[in-house]
Amino acid sequence: MLFKQLILVATALTTLAVATPAVMRRTEPASSCSTGPVNCCNSSGTAKDGNIAKELALLGIVVPDINALIGVSCSPITVIGAGGASCSSQTLCCEDNKYNGIVALGCIPVDISL
């Protein structure tokens, strides 16, 4: 009897896992970045991520949406498609870049490939 219940629960969980859509971050073309230059960031994550949370706390930054994408150690890519503009890390378009590249808030991944 216990074995049947275990099989039933396992089947239900498997069905739920298959039916649940995966969370996907959208990627925008670089031309849609209206907040300034596209940034090349060493890493990105959310305010829930341990290292990012520590960095935000040290800077005294309170993020209203803990699920919003945050760029870390960012520098602007000023000329996209001009041959020299490249980023081996993550390219992001961010709304709030006033922290001297340490962090950038409200980011969306962008595609700089042509």
From Swiss-Prot:
GO terms for cellular component: extracellular region; fungal-type cell wall. GO terms for molecular function: structural constituent of cell wall. Its main location: secreted. Disulfide bonds join C33-C93, C40-C87, C41-C74, C94-C107. Aerial growth, conidiation, and dispersal of filamentous fungi in the environment rely upon a capability of their secreting small amphipathic proteins called hydrophobins (HPBs) with low sequence identity. Class I can self-assemble into an outermost layer of rodlet bundles on aerial cell surfaces, conferring cellular hydrophobicity that supports fungal growth, development and dispersal; whereas Class II form highly ordered films at water-air interfaces through intermolecular interactions but contribute nothing to the rodlet structure. Self-assembles to form functional amyloid fibrils called rodlets. Self-assembly into fibrillar rodlets occurs spontaneously at hydrophobic:hydrophilic interfaces and the rodlets further associate laterally to form amphipathic monolayers. This is Class I hydrophobin 6. It comes from Pleurotus ostreatus (strain PC15) (Oyster mushroom). The gene is Hydph6.
